[in-house]
Amino acid sequence: MKIKSSLKSLKKRDLNSKLVRRRGRVYIINKTNPKFKARQK
């Protein structure tokens, strides 16, 4: 999982990426290609 201060560019990397908020943190999840997971710092 990548940890970045800005997730906008990471969201554009794949069409299936979704932005999710969990416990006050922002995540990018991707069911079809899990290598695109990311969390905002």
Swiss-Prot record:
It comes from the Bacteria. The keyword Ribosomal protein applies. GO terms for molecular function: structural constituent of ribosome. Pfam families: Ribosomal_L36. InterPro entries: Ribosomal_bL36, Ribosomal_bL36_sp, Ribosomal_L36_bact. The keyword Cell wall biogenesis/degradation does not apply. Keywords: Ribonucleoprotein, Ribosomal protein. GO terms for biological process: translation. GO terms for cellular component: ribonucleoprotein complex; ribosome. Transmembrane segments: none annotated. Belongs to the bacterial ribosomal protein bL36 family. This is Large ribosomal subunit protein bL36.
